[in-house]
Each structure stands twice: as C-alpha cells, then as structure tokens.
Regions:
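Residue-level preference for the first positions of well-ordered beta-strands
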Residues: 27-29, 59-61, 105, 123, ...
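ASCE P-loop NTPase helicase motor core
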Residues: 131-202
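Conserved P-loop
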Residues: 25-94, 182
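Walker B catalytic acidic pair
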Residues: 127-129
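Pre-P-loop entry segment of helicase/translocase ATPase cores
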Residues: 1-27
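Short, solvent-exposed loop/turn segments at secondary-structure junctions
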Residues: 35-36, 67-69, 159-161, 187, ...
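Inter-Walker segment of RecA-like/P-loop motor cores
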Residues: 67-122, 215
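ATPase catalytic-site recognition across NTP-hydrolyzing enzymes
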Residues: 187-225
Length: 225
C-alpha cells in the first residue's frame, strides 16, 4: 500500500470564511462584498476536496460566467495553491490541474455550459452566479453531480433579485444548505478609509450592491431573471 504524504497548501483562510470551510452541508451559498476573498476560498475548497475525495478519479470544477473570466479570476490561484503538491501537472490550454491521486480541477465558462454535458462532478463552484444563465445549473451542472452525490457552492455579489437571490433565499431556510453573507461594513477586510473613499465615488446603489451585498439596489442593464 502506498504511503500517504502530508501536503501543505500555502493558504491561510480568512476568519470570515472559517465556517464555510468547516461546514458539513452539501450545498452552500456565499454572498460577499468585492475583494472579500471568495474566489481564493472557493479554489482552495476545490483543491482540498480533490485531494481528499475517496472516489476514484475525482473531478472538481470551477465555473465563471465566461471562460476568459474563469482564467482571469481563478487560473493563477489554482496554479499557485497546487504548486507545492508533488507530481502536480498544470495544463493551461485546458485550464486544468491534474493531481497525483488522479484528481482533477478544471475551469469552465457558463457561456459554453453545454461543454459540461456528459461529465461527472464530485464538486463544483459557481462564481458570480448572478451573471449566469440559470440553465447552466439546472440543465447541465446539477445532473452532473447526481451519480457521485457531488456538492455545489454558489458565490458572488448581488445583481438584483435574480437566480442568485433565489439560491440565497433557499439557502437561508434549508437545513441541507449553508448560507453566508459578508458585508464590507462588518468584515473589516477592506480598510475603512478605502470604504469612505468608495462611498464618494460610487453611486448609492453601486456601493450598496458591491460592498454591502444588497439585492435591492438598482442594477443598470439587463440580467437573467
């Protein structure tokens, strides 16, 4: 039998995300202000799950609204935090990292969500879900979790009362869901002086939405309902 090897990932969770990492619920929803660190937390959750999964050939996915956005938001973090793992292989053309236990973490864009048809998933993070077509979840991603009883985490900043709001409302009252809401005025992650400056530069609705995670702030332009 091969000996297990201790691997230390260079990630120190922010206190605001400690309960997220310690949760036991299968489903999770995080509504967080800008620059809270939600993508870093989510990527490390995927890495840990891929390393600890007891099923053969674990498959984990990170989904952003667009493939280019997934690369910009998460690829650097995925490479950074998996770099210390012996035998890890990064494939930039496919935006995936292969781990020595057979696990794989891959980045996708919801703009081409049918690319996920036919695959299985042990876990998935949907980042900035408010900007996604909800059919990506209901028609493709949710069925991909079924046979392996995979988990899902929805994260993002509000954009009105759309599909992300519906997910959060469900998460708040369902026993099999974990819900977390992080407002900049409460977390202390953004310096107070910076928040004061932003209040003078952003509109009232923009600040309420981006920093105070308000679902009721007005949103310019169209979004999926």
């Amino acid at each position: 039998m091969a000996k297990s090897r201790k691997v230390v990932i260079p990630y120190a969770p922010r206190a605001a995300f400690a309960e997220f990492h310690d949760r036991s619920e299968r489903w999770a929803c995080i509504v967080a202000h800008r620059r809270a660190g939600k993508t870093v937390a989510a990527i490390n959750q995927l890495i840990r799950a891929a390393l600890r999964c007891e099923r053969p050939q674990p498959r984990l996915a990170y989904v952003a609204p667009y493939t280019s956005q997934a690369k910009d938001l998460a690829w650097g973090y995925l490479k950074q935090y998996t770099a210390p793992i012996p035998g890890v292989r990064a494939n930039v053309s496919e935006l995936r990292v292969d781990l020595p236990n057979g696990g794989r973490v891959r980045l996708y864009g919801a703009d081409n969500y049918n690319r996920l048809r036919g695959i299985y998933l042990d876990g998935v993070v949907l980042d900035e879900y408010a900007d996604m077509d909800p059919r990506a979840w209901s028609e493709v991603i949710r069925p991909a979790l079924a046979d392996r009883a995979g988990w899902a985490t929805f994260i993002g900043t509000p954009k009105g009362r759309n599909g992300f709001w519906e997910i959060y409302e469900k998460a708040k009252v369902s026993p099999d869901w974990f819900a977390l809401r992080l407002k900049a005025s409460q977390t202390g992650l953004v310096p107070a002086a910076e928040l004061d400056a932003m209040r003078g530069e952003l509109s009232v609705d923009e600040y309420a939405r981006e920093m105070e995670t308000s679902f009721d702030a007005a949103v310019a332009g169209a979004y999926y309902a």
